[in-house]
């Protein structure tokens, strides 16, 4: 027997390279022929003529040898191609007879095969996807729920099926989308399947929409599947169902739990409706993984925007996830979600930042901005608290900033409070309070108050030190006579009081402050920053940047509000950066918010970017998030600022700011700010920050009304790419960030859902896994949005690890959006990503969107193509097209499978015919050569009619 192991894909690639090389050599020979085969004599004498003839003869001999070499090269390439085809045909023919008996035994005894992908649930039935093989195989996608029926107590959409579980090596299947309801409640999306050891959890299915203009509620999105125990990304939660009229938007599904090193899945976005659906909670991180980011709250057209989902809790040694931003509303913006808490034994990992409050109101009716979410708390012993989220913009009142999280009990600084939102017509939002530090650490700075033309918001209270550390600065009051917040008192042993701290009644404490002021004076004079202490806040009306923290420790100060001043850098050794000031209000030109300050070298969180200013023309651009601490240990990036709103008729909403980058070794990258809701067009979401060595990229910010979400940040060397931001209403989702060299790709953002007569945007594309990642998956594509006409297309799944991606599976394509009328079609499913070059199963194509409701039989969206597997992996299943009439659905799937089988059979027959022609060609050539030898020897011979037989490359498959 043969002991040769052949990879048909590698042989085919080698044949292609050789053919290209032969073409290049032939072109070079042809170009040189004229100058080497017919040389002109240098003179008219006989010697020159003889020399020219001699060299010309050498050139002609070379061309003759080149022609023979070219013929041999063509034969070799042909033999290599036919050999690869023969290996592929033999491999395909041998798989079924060898594997089928084994799989039948396991199916009969366990209900799932040993090797192979699980079957997809039939569309329109809500059937669960089949489980993948015990050893290798992806779980099947759950079937979509059936549409509701007219009249009576009916009208509710059917629930989508759950995705199948993955095998030991394989991804969990995506949950099916909930059915569209004619009235009542849309069907719930199915839960994504769980991976076992190596693989990504399946994405949760999107909730079904509601067609009726009055009453009802969109279906809840399904929960994302859990990641594999060792490697793989957790599944993202499904988006809540979109509704028309006065119906309520569905809640987003929770993200799946991470594996050993994986981050928890991102929560699904809430559905749009009269009241926006709440964003799903981020999934819990694995043992060393960070918690997932909470989902974006849904848009509301006549009530409250959806509340952002809470960030997931970090694993035992992981950081907390960031809270989701609140949904925009025409009345009152939704509150941002709370940041997740870090793991109990996390060494320095920070709590997650609170989500940004949603914008609320209109120019004529007023409205209230949503409150920022609270920052998450650090671990039990070490770590800083998360920053509070900024309050949302309100056409009447601005939203209140979220409070900062508390630090670990031994070491760490309190989180900074979020800035209050701008109130256009009445009052600015109050700044959030700073968090409490550990025994060693600075109190968090209070957030700046929001600006207003009538009454500015008060600044937030600074956190109080415990043993060694400065008190936090009180936040500056907002423009419009806002009062500064009260500063925090320093630690008992060492530290300076924060800005605007109350006068001490203790003589010992007063002596301590005076001594430190004397010590700091020469450092302040020579370097512009103290030795110990916080930087000074920018005075309102001066436009000054916030001062830098002390050389040893101290927080950077907040930038001057209303001028877009930058926050000060944190203390050189440890300390948090200050928040950037918001941009100027009521200006015709753009007014950019200030950038957040950088954190300390060793420990420190970057400050949050300021909100862009309000403009009568073009809205201000949101300030960039503060850079993470340039640290050898820990430093989290700040959250990007929100884009400024535009109140002019032809105004343009500002884009959200970019999140700050994480520290060199550890720390969470900042989330991009969300785009402004006001203005046409509205602002796009900001991009997430890039991760550090072991950190994941930050999530992209949500887009403003009808605007696209921001792209996720790229992961660090071992980090996962960030999740793309969700598009709002008709906007496209942002693309997921690429994984680091050894990391997984980020998940694409979900597209927003459209209203009556609107086509929605497509889901974001998943990020690619890192070049050398072992077992990492490409990110899943985002789901397309639902619409009354044509649903948005699902995003393409990211590719698995490129070079040595051991069992790196490509991401599953996103689900197409569901059309809510009977006259149009659902969105096309996204294509599955490719597996790793050597090892790895390919991603399954996304299911096409639902094509009709109970009123008729619309056309389902086309299913996405499955991805290409690696040399030792399984190819991805194509997504089925969704239609509502049962007989059409069954006939379509049968035709699809039959067409695939017929294509394989035709390819094998072409390969067999090509091999036969090659054998006839070789026999004919041998007979011609034998005839020539006999003719030279003077012996008669017959050719038996072999002339003219040839085997050209065109005969080969």
From Swiss-Prot:
It holds the Pfam family PE. A cleavage of the protein removes the N-terminal 120-150 residues, immediately upstream the PGRS domain. The exact position of the cleavage site could not be identified. Residues 893-925 have a biased composition (Basic residues). It comes from the Bacteria. Residues 893-957 are annotated as: Disordered. GO terms for cellular component: cell outer membrane; cell surface; extracellular region. InterPro entries: PE-PGRS_N. It is found in: Cell outer membrane; Secreted; Secreted, Cell wall; Cell surface. Keywords: Cell outer membrane, Cell wall, Membrane, Repeat, Secreted, Virulence. The keyword ATP-binding does not apply. Its main location: membrane. The keyword Secreted applies. Residues 4-94 form the PE domain. Induction: Specifically expressed under low phosphate concentrations. Expression is very low and undetectable under classical growth conditions but long-term exposure to low phosphate triggers its expression. Administration of free phosphate, cardiolipin and phosphatidylinositol to phosphate-starved culture turns off expression of the gene. Belongs to the mycobacterial PE family. PGRS subfamily. Expression in M.smegmatis enhances adhesion of M.smegmatis to murine macrophages and human alveolar epithelial cells and improves bacterial persistence in spleen tissue following infection in mice. Overexpression in M.tuberculosis improves adhesion to pneumocytes, but not to phagocytic cells. The 77 amino acids long, arginine-rich C-terminal domain plays a critical role in tuberculosis pathogenesis. This positively charged helical domain specifically binds phosphorylated phosphatidylinositols and cardiolipin, whereas it is unable to bind other phospholipids. The arginine-rich C-terminal region protrudes from the mycobacterial membrane and mediates M.tuberculosis entry into host epithelial cells. May serve as a bridge between mycobacteria and host cells by interacting with specific host phospholipids and extracting them from host cells, for their direct integration or as a source of phosphate, during phases of TB pathogenesis when M.tuberculosis is short of phosphate supply. This is PE-PGRS family protein PE_PGRS3. It comes from Mycobacterium tuberculosis (strain ATCC 25618 / H37Rv).
């Amino acid at each position: 027997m043969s002991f040769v192991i052949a990879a048909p894909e590698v042989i085919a690639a080698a044949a292609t390279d050789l053919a290209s090389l032969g073409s290049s050599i032939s072109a070079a020979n042809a170009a040189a022929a004229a100058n080497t085969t017919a040389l002109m004599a240098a003179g008219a004498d006989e010697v020159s003529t003889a020399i020219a003839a001699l060299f010309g003869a050498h050139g002609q001999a070379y061309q003759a040898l080149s022609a023979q070499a070219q013929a041999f090269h063509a034969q070799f390439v042909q033999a290599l191609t036919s050999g690869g085809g023969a290996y592929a045909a033999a491999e395909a023919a041998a798989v079924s007879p060898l594997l089928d008996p084994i799989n039948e035994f396991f199916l009969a005894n366990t209900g799932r095969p040993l090797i192979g992908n699980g079957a997809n649930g039939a569309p329109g039935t809500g059937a669960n996807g089949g489980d993948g093989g015990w050893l290798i195989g992806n779980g099947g996608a759950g079937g979509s729920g059936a549409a509701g029926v007219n009249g009576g107590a009916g009208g509710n959409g059917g629930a989508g099926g759950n995705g199948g579980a993955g095998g030991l090596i394989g991804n969990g299947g995506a949950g099916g989308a909930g059915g569209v309801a004619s009235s009542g409640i849309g069907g719930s999306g199915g839960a994504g399947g769980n991976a076992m050891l190596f693989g990504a959890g399946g994405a949760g299915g999107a909730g079904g929409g509601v067609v009726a203009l009055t009453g009802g509620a969109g279906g809840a999105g399904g929960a994302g599947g859990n990641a594999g125990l060792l490697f793989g990304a957790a599944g993202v939660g499904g988006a809540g169902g979109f509704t028309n009229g006065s119906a309520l938007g569905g809640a987003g599904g929770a993200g799946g739990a991470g594996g050993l090193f994986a981050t928890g899945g991102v929560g699904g976005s809430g559905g749009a409706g009269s009241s926006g659906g709440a964003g799903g909670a981020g999934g819990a991180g694995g043992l060393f993984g960070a918690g997932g980011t909470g989902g974006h709250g849904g848009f509301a057209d006549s009530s409250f925007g959806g509340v952002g989902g809470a960030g997931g809790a970090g694993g035992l040694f992981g950081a907390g996830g960031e809270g989701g931003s609140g949904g925009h509303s025409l009345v009152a913006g939704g509150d941002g979600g709370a940041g997740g808490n870090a793991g109990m034994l996390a060494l320095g990992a920070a709590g997650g930042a609170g989500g940004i409050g949603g914008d609320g109101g209109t120019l004529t009716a007023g409205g209230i901005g949503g409150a920022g979410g609270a920052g998450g708390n650090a671990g039990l012993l070490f770590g800083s608290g998360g920053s509070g989220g900024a309050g949302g913009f309100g056409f009447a009142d601005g939203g209140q900033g979220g409070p900062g999280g508390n630090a670990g009990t031994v070491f760490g600084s309190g989180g900074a409070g979020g800035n209050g939102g701008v109130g256009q017509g009445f009052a600015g939002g109050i700044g959030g309070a700073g968090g409490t530090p550990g025994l060693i650490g600075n109190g968090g700075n209070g957030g700046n108050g929001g600006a207003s033309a009538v009454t500015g918001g008060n600044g937030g209270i600074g956190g109080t030190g415990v043993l060694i550390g400065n008190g936090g600065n009180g936040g500056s009051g907002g423009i419009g006579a806002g009062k500064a917040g009260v500063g925090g008192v320093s630690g008992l042993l060492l530290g300076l009081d924060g800005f605007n701290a109350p006068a001490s009644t203790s003589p010992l404490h007063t002596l301590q402050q005076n001594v430190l002021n004397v010590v700091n004076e020469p450092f302040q004079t020579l370097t512009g920053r103290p030795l110990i202490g916080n930087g000074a806040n920018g005075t309102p009306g001066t436009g000054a940047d916030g001062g830098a923290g002390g050389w040893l420790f101290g927080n950077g100060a907040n930038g001057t509000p209303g001028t877009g001043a930058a926050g000060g850098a944190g203390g050189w050794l440890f300390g948090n950066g200050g928040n950037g000031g918001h941009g100027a209000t009521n200006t015709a030109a753009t007014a950019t918010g200030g950038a957040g300050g950088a954190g300390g070298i060793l420990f420190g969180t970057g400050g949050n970017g300021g909100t862009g200013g309000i403009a009568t023309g073009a809205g201000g651009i949101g300030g960039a998030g503060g850079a993470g601490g340039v640290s050898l240990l820990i430093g989290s990036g700040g959250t990007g600022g929100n884009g400024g709103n535009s109140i002019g008729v032809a105004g343009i909403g500002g884009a959200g700011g970019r999140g700050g980058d994480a520290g060199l070794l550890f720390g969470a990258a900042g989330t991009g700010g969300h785009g402004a809701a006001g203005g046409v067009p509205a602002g796009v979401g900001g991009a997430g920050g890039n991760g550090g060595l072991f950190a994941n990229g930050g999530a992209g910010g949500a887009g403003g009304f009808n605007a696209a979400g921001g792209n996720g940040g790229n992961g660090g060397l071992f980090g996962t790419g960030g999740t793309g931001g969700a598009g709002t209403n008709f906007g496209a989702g942002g693309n997921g960030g690429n994984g680091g060299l050894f990391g997984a790709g980020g998940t694409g953002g979900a597209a927003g859902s459209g209203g009556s007569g609107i086509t929605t945007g497509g889901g974001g594309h998943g990020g690619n896994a890192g070049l050398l990642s072992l077992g990492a998956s490409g990110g899943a594509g985002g789901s397309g949005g639902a619409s009354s006409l044509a649903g948005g297309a699902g995003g393409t799944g990211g590719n698995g690890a490129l070079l040595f991606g051991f069992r790196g599976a490509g991401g599953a394509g996103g689900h197409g959006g569901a059309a809510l009328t009977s006259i149009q079609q659902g969105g096309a499913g996204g294509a599955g990503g490719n597996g790793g070059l050597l090892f790895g199963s390919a991603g399954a194509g996304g299911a096409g969107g639902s094509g009709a409701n109970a009123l008729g039989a619309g056309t389902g969206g086309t299913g996405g193509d499955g991805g290409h597997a690696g040399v030792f992996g399984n190819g991805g299943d194509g997504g089925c097209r969704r239609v509502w009439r049962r007989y059409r659905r069954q006939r379509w799937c049968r035709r699809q499978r039959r067409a695939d089988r017929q294509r394989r059979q035709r390819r094998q027959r072409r390969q067999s015919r090509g091999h036969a022609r090659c054998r006839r060609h070789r026999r004919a050539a041998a007979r011609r050569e034998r005839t020539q030898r006999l003719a030279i020897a003077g012996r008669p011979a017959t050719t038996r009619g072999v002339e003219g037989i040839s085997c050209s490359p065109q005969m080969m498959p």
